[in-house]
Every structure is written in structure tokens, then in C-alpha cells.
Amino acid sequence: MIVHAHNNDFMQKGKKALFYKFMHYRNKKKVKQYATDYFACSELAGEFFFEDEVRQSPHYHIINNAIDSKRFKFDSEMRNIYRRDLHLENKITIINTARFNYQKNLLFLIDIFDELKNKDDRFELVLVGDGELRGELEQKISDLNLTDSVQLLGLRSDIPELLSAADIFLFPSRFEGFGISLLEAQASGLLSFTSKTVVPESVGITDLLTYISLDESPVEWAEMIYSQFTSRDIDRNKYTDIIKEKGFDIDTEAKRLKSYLDD
């Protein structure tokens, strides 16, 4: 039996979290009684889920969260079509693809976007997803008078095309087991920003990704984002090859997983 670790913190907060922490501590000690192999999507996820004894055993493996990298290759034709359809021409487009929940920290993202908008009125925000915090998110957008600059697209199946249409990927999560959305963004050649220490360093496989501490203010996040965006010239076409070379393409990782299972 394989047990797989996919996150590095609890989704539940408040009183519920106490129960989940107790059960997590209890089951962390018991899991080795039942499992034959232990997989994790990152070292952070493995440290959260498994005891040291498990992580030092030959049956413990990091299995890369992989993507079909060719699907996410930057497409200039789709970029032009989507920017026209979404009225993003002449805009600096920030995108986030995530569930609207506590983990993804989207209220903080709105604060960062507000600071960027103060720097340059061309900024536009596209949020792809849905979730329990949608109402709070809409209220905050309204309170900051950002309604005309933020598009909530809901759940979509055309993520690769939307990434091609964007200029910046912003992902200030409170915690992540890996952060596969960041991998997709890098495959599309998007300048990307995420949270330091709570998002695994293993997802930063290109020079596109910058980590910023959540202890920094929205002003400081905005300064870093704006500085990089205005000073870098990026060839977005080359990054799918880098994803493959680093072992994060689905075909490569599927073969590696099969070799473990065949042993």
C-alpha cells in the first residue's frame, strides 16, 4: 500500500484544527504499520506527513508533480485572441488560478494588486477559480474600487490559453505541498511570484519564479513585482523544454513512477 503526502499544513483553522492536528499526530505514528511505500510531492509535504524514520527509509520517494508541458507552451496566437476577447489589450495582466479559500490567500493578493494599480493604471487582474471565499473576495474588490480592473472567470478548462494571455502569475499561498499551478505558469514562460518558506523551493525550477516572504507588506510585494516586470525581457517560448529537462514533464515522471512500482 502506498501513502502519498500532498500538502504541508492543515486546511482547517480554529477549533476544528485542534481535532485534525490530534488525528494527524496519531496517524503519523501509525501509518508505517500499514504502508509498504511512502510518496510525497515535495520535501515539505514529506516532513509534514511522515516521521523521520519513514523519510530515511529506502521506501520513501519524492514523486514530482508533473504536467503535460506541451499543453502549456506559450502560444502567441492564443494570447492575441484571448487578450482581445477579455479586453486586455494594452493591459499588464496578472493571473491567479486557484480555489478561493484560506490556503490560497487571495484577499492578500487583492491588497498587492491594489498597490500595483496605484503604481500603474494599466494593471488588470484575472482570477480563475471559485470557492467558499468568493463573497468576501467580491466585497473586498468592491471596497477598494477595483471592480472595473478585476475579472472573476470562474472554473475554466482553458488554463493554458489564459496563461498565454497573461503577463504575471501571482500566487501568495499560505502553504502548498508543491504548487503545480506555478509549474504550469513557468511552462508558459510567465514571470511568477509566490510565498517564501511555505511554498517548496522544488517548484522553482526556472529563473521565472521569485519567492517573497508573507511577512512583507503588500507594498513590498508590489515593489518587487513591478521592479522585475519593468526590467526583464523574457523569451516565453523556451520554458517547456526546461520543464522537460528538469524531470517535471508527465511522460518522464510516469516512467519513473512505473520503475518504482515494478521493483
Model segments located where?
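A charged, aromatic-enriched C-terminal amphipathic alpha-helix characteristic of glycosyltransferases
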Residues: 233-263
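A short helix/loop element that forms part of the nucleotide-sugar donor recognition site in Leloir-type
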Residues: 73-87
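Nucleotide-activated donor-binding/catalytic signature segment of Leloir-type glycosyltransferases, i.e.
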Residues: 138-154
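A conserved mid-protein helix/loop that constitutes part of the nucleotide-sugar donor-binding site
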Residues: 92-115, 132-138
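Short hydrophobic beta-strand element within catalytic cores of glycosyltransferases
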Residues: 191-196, 201
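Aromatic "clamp/platform" in nucleotide-sugar-dependent glycosyltransferases that forms part
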Residues: 155, 174
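A short, active-site helix/loop in glycosyltransferases that binds the activated sugar's phosphate group
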Residues: 32-72
